[in-house]
Amino acid sequence: LCNPHNPIGQIWKEKDLVRLAELANRYGVIVYSDEIFADNCYQGLTCPCYLDIKGAKSHAIVATGLGKSFGFTGVNHANIIIADDELRARFTDRRTRDHYGSLDPCVYECVLSAYTKDGKAWVDASNAYVWENMCVLRDYFAKHLPKARVCGGEGAYILWIDWAAYFSSGDELN
């Protein structure tokens, strides 16, 4: 699961996540929820954490991180959140056997700096700036290329342009 979805930026609705949790419980599936774009939501929208969904705690592994929020995707870092004790023990055992999961000192300092009031203020200001740019882009297309459809923009910072109205076939578009 990727919430908000990458690459389209859709924030999954709670009712859809509840249904996913029901199915995962019925079929014994572990859900790995990539929520790395969760800090990047616009228009007052928020991304529901999968662990907060009814019935999800027993089978959920949630990954968050700072790469998208702070623009340092080259820094290898993720927060893994597992509420269920047995699932966490299985994950930790595997992590230990595979020798991964430690932080280098630089990443450690980045994480400590980011999870502060100043870090949140920076993310909020960055999101406002990105949203303004998305609006500029949408306005430009509405004025100059009105048949192009701008898609995305709930979460993440990616917009897609549907150019189909300007071409009579896929071959022409290519």
Q: What is each of the regions a protein language model found here?
A:
Residues 1-174:
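PLP-dependent class I/II
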